[in-house]
């Protein structure tokens, strides 16, 4: 890894002892900084406190005394900690720079970075780029908001690697020198306004992905999103558009039902596995980014024609007796289920339900065009029955996802899609959307692959 000489001997506060905080503290100690780490939870709730102290790091738990900032030249904070936190506000008042862990990862990395952000589609696009590069003989390492701590990956990365990094607005706010070789900005929707305060601040945080890029760097951006187009107007990178609607000859686009990158035909959309207009955008963005980072057309084509989707995110599970099964357990809101349904122009048996947050499901009415039946479960099942009645769609209820899937199979015929896309959070019955999706996968796999 590269040395960061300006941090040697400097006192640095790491705020938050989640995964990225612990990784940052250990990295800073390795660099040669004097490190103190602080978390509001008690020491009894911090199993890694001993490891940190063994590395020479001062551990302060059980509150946020402002004295932890005394003598500090830098604050590295967990991305989820808001800027309204008393320690963060005090650091700002004292003029102490505030970073997140991806800034550290960038500074030490010997490998080039491909960074992907956006309100939706980050994980799918990040995974696609990683697969395209891997199949092309590059050595990609996936990291960031996708679950692998970026600074841990960056310590292991060599010059021959490429770090493919999923980054959130929370992470990007704490960057200073961060400069990926290729950046992707997928889209912008109103989100996280409780954290950022205003839509303008949220957009500005996203735009930091390209703030330091120059003409030798590439920003792949959504030319169909007017907010993104406006936000990048002063960016110094070489701009590479992608568009699902128009032909953009200097980027990635769809022409006559085929994905192109510049003048290179990549793949007919009919041969891609991922359904939905939103996934066309993800595929276009990934194609452009991977091509710019050294992937071959042949291997991009191979990945797009075989990639089943990220687990629980409109994931293609398999087929049985002419029925196709998709796991979209990550669809924890109505907007996500609308996006999933937009991807199918064949009969769908929809499995939906979960935690009742007081939502009005009438927003889904227009999206039920191809839905032949609804299997509703969980706290919202009565609301979903009412929705189905308004749409003149057959509906039944179930207790849990496995029961719902059995009933969905019984209601389906060859040529149909059986889709788990709950439109609700899982917490009425499941600890997480992953646990809910795994129950669906377990049952479907017993059908597809009987023991």
From Swiss-Prot:
Domain of life: Bacteria
NCBIfam families in UniProt: murD (TIGR01087)
GO terms classed as biological process: cell division; cell wall organization; peptidoglycan biosynthetic process; regulation of cell shape
Purpose: Cell wall formation. Catalyzes the addition of glutamate to the nucleotide precursor UDP-N-acetylmuramoyl-L-alanine (UMA).
Family to which the UniProt record says this protein belongs: Belongs to the MurCDEF family.
Protein's cellular compartments: Cytoplasm
Gene3D superfamilies membership: Mur ligase, C-terminal domain, Mur-like, catalytic domain, NAD(P)-binding Rossmann-like Domain
Pathway annotation: Cell wall biogenesis; peptidoglycan biosynthesis
This enzyme's EC code(s): 6.3.2.9
InterPro entries attached to this UniProt entry: Mur-like_cat_sf, Mur_ligase_C, Mur_ligase_C_dom_sf, Mur_ligase_cen, MurD
Gene Ontology molecular functions: ATP binding; UDP-N-acetylmuramoylalanine-D-glutamate ligase activity
A Pfam entry, by short name: Mur_ligase_C
Catalytic reaction list: UDP-N-acetyl-alpha-D-muramoyl-L-alanine + D-glutamate + ATP = UDP-N-acetyl-alpha-D-muramoyl-L-alanyl-D-glutamate + ADP + phosphate + H(+)
Protein name, per record: UDP-N-acetylmuramoylalanine--D-glutamate ligase
GO cellular component: cytoplasm
Keywords assigned: ATP-binding, Cell cycle, Cell division, Cell shape, Cell wall biogenesis/degradation, Cytoplasm, Ligase, Nucleotide-binding, Peptidoglycan synthesis
Main EC class the enzyme belongs to: ligase
Predominant place of localization: cytoplasm
Record field: transmembrane: none
Binding residues for ATP: 118-124
